[in-house]
Regions:
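Alpha-helical linker/hinge and terminal dimerization helices associated
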Residues: 22, 26-29, 64, 107-126, ...
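Short, hydrophobic-biased segments on the C-terminal half of alpha helices
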Residues: 57, 75-76
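Charged, amphipathic alpha-helical coiled-coil/dimerization segments
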Residues: 76-134
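N-terminal helix-turn-helix DNA-binding core of bacterial DNA-binding proteins
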Residues: 24-69, 154
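C-terminal regulatory/oligomerization modules of transcriptional regulators
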Residues: 1-4, 129-161
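N-terminal leader segment of winged-helix/HTH proteins
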Residues: 1-34, 81
Length: 161
């Protein structure tokens, strides 16, 4: 397999460093404002935006690109904190339905203004409208290409020999 071209390598490292810096800043803000990890905040934010403020565990795992076991652990922590509830889906006994509680909605509302400020400051303020349009188009194509692969929540585990 051929090595990456220098411009590909530069782009890859710039992307990874930018994502890492943004993720670190967002993680710090979410912890300071809401005493949650970024993954926990993502789960609550997705539930807050979902129809009827609920999703199945599988939909949550696919939406946040997180393993089933990791999601089960995070959901347990959020449920213990009173931020979500979990119940068997009335439509499919095999599915677990996750619903955000009033306390969960309040926590998202407390975190969101600072979260928006961090994202705007670090990601969007340095970009022109044209830059934003170009970046959005590129990242949308890359995301769609990656999402065309089977979601991790349905991937089978590889057995060790």
């Amino acid at each position: 397999m051929a090595a990456l071209e220098p411009e590909q390598l530069d782009t890859y490292f710039a992307l990874m460093e930018s994502v890492s810096l943004l993720h670190h800043a967002v993680e710090q803000q979410v912890r300071a404002a809401g005493e949650l990890s970024y993954v926990q905040f993502q789960l609550l934010a997705r539930l807050a935006d979902a129809p009827d403020r609920q999703l199945t565990m599988t939909a949550l795992a696919d939406g946040v690109v997180y393993s089933r076991s990791g999601l089960t652990h995070q959901a347990g922590l959020l449920e213990k904190a009173g931020l979500i509830t979990r119940a068997t889906s009335p439509d499919d006994q095999r599915a677990t339905l996750v619903t955000i509680t009033r306390a969960g909605l309040d926590r998202v509302a407390a975190i969101l203004p600072g979260h928006v400020d961090v994202v705007r400051d670090l990601l969007f303020d340095p970009l022109s409208k044209k830059d934003l349009d170009v970046l959005g188009g590129i990242m949308g194509r890359v995301r769609d290409h990656m999402r065309a692969q089977p979601p991790r929540s349905v991937s089978t585990r590889k057995r060790r020999a």
